Amino acid sequence: MKIGVPKEIKPQEHRIGLTPESVKTLISEGHEVLVENNGGFEAGFENDQYTSVGAKIVDKAEDIFNDADIIVKVKEPQAGEVKMIRENQIVYTYLHLAAAKELTEGLIKSKSVCIAYETVTDNNGRLPLLAPMSAVAGRMSVQAGAHCLEKNQNGRGLLLGGAPGVEGGTVVILGGGVVGENAAVIATGMRAKVHIVDKSEARLKQLVEMFGDKIIPEQSDKIDLNKLVAEADLLIGGVLIPGAEAPKLVTKPMLKLMKRGSVIVDVAIDQGGCVETSKPTTHGDPTFIIDDVVHYCVANMPGGVPRTSTIALNTATLPHLIKIANKGYAKALSDDKHLLAGLNVCKGQVTYKAVADVFGYDYVDPLKTL
């Protein structure tokens, strides 16, 4: 197959769909790879690293979309890219459709085959293609939040890790999944006071086994969330419902309970955010203030560390891409129920129930579209 890797065009997005090492593997399997000129430059991958393993460098994204059987990206197709997607073309990338009605409509009209990294599953019901970026975003969330707490960023003027004789700040993490766990790694390392909120008692026990008394576990149905939000210097939103819009756990009235200059980092913003007042921002303009609370809602946080993120992502996405390229999408999907779970839109039909439900589309069994 002919595999195309366009340069990412979302603002301040510096990752790329494939590393040179991944390209080398695909070419060894007999496939052709087209990479847009300087597509990997910001992630530290030069054109000659791609050509040295057999890739063809293409000057225009249009030519990649015109020629490739499979488009491999990182972020969801932007408006200009959606217009170039062809019927029956395979699009393999993060999509986050439950928070993107216009994109969903565009992909339906394109009659393409859209496989979303974030809904591919594994034998344990986890999301292995989402996990690497969730880990990166979780770790970055505390770094970003700590920076936003500085006075010149309109924060409280508080050093999250404290100082000799001075207590550190309080971090409240909503969600004990991959984002929450990795946020806790950094927050506990900074010696902040860390609360982790999750609905699963079993998951909280796992986190206590990992972190010991460095965290305070909070079961969501047994706490007063208002009180906990009021204590937070830094609130991390890391709640996920696979493929669906994130639940709004923190409402606008709850902001009035928070300290002036406290910070919210809503990692769930890709899926609409778990804070009512959240709206997507960019690395270039990452924050806004509502009711004296700083909101950091960058929708592509891992794009700020593109080299680490690209390598981590490829480790997870490449094995499935090889299956798709070697077998064709229909056989690859029908042979693997976990990859099939990634099929969100196929040839004009919505094949992921959470997306169909949120926008009122008819849900079609993905196997019936192959």
Where are these regions (language model features)?
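Short glycine-/small-residue-rich Rossmann-like dinucleotide-binding loops
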Residues: D69, K75-E76, L95-H96, D221, ...
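Rossmann-like adenosine-cofactor binding region
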Residues: E209-D291
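Glycine-rich phosphate/diphosphate-binding loop of Rossmann-like nucleotide-binding domains
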Residues: P6-K7, P11-G44, N152-L240, T287
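Residue-level detector of alpha-helix initiation sites
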Residues: E76, V136, G177-V178
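Glycine/serine-rich phosphate-binding loop and adjoining beta1-alpha1 elements at the start
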Residues: K2, E8, A79-G169, V298-N300
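An N-terminal-biased, well-structured beta-alpha scaffold segment characteristic
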Residues: K2-G106, S110
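Adenosine-phosphate binding glycine-rich loop
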Residues: E118-L159, I269, C274-L370
